[in-house]
Amino acid sequence: MFLILTCLLVGVGYWSTPAASGEKRIPVATSDEGKVPVGKLKPGDASPEFMAVDSNRRLVSLKDFKGKYVYVDLWATWCSPCVGQIPHLQRLEKLFKGKKIVFVSISCDEDVDEWLGYLRKNKMEGVQLNFDCNRRFQDAYGVKAIPRFILLDKKGRVVNPNMTRPSDPETEKTLNALKGI
């Protein structure tokens, strides 16, 4: 009986881990450098500034999106749950085209050339950035696994640090309800 109970508990523990559910853990360390408490961003807080490389190898800043809502998608090419959200994200991008919202996909891929190849091969458009999951950004948002979605307002403040996935019908409803979109 003890052996059966032990096996059951170990099995439940394994299947509830991110690896078993298809999520990839990102190593996150606490940060002394940030002005934002680690993992404490909440609605209304200013998002930490970030800079990342776009698909044309130019630096892009959060400031570049001022005046628009920003739906951030943290993903990687090796993350199957992330890749599974891409068609849903593309549908939202088309649905909200011309509105005051930008969909920003930030890749955590370490190999920029591999990431660029993936973008070309899959004809991915829109704002595509890569910054190998910048630690300050991870720390500020408490990012421990991807995919992860974040919604910012037109002034770069956090609306939802744990936004719903593009595949969730609530996402479209939430975006439609944004003031001045």
Predicted regions and their residues:
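Thiol-/selenol-based redox modules, centered on thioredoxin-like
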Residues: L151-I181
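Short, internal strand/loop/helix patches
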Residues: V53, L116-K155
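Bacterial N-terminal signal peptides
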Residues: L3-G11
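A short beta-strand-turn-helix
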Residues: F50-V70
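Structural microenvironment flanking redox-active thiols in thiol-disulfide oxidoreductases
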Residues: G84-N122, C133-D139
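N-proximal helix/coil linker or "cap" segments that precede and/or mark the start of modular domains
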Residues: G13-E49, K63, G117-R120
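Conserved redox-active cysteine motifs that mediate thiol-disulfide chemistry
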Residues: G67, L74-R91
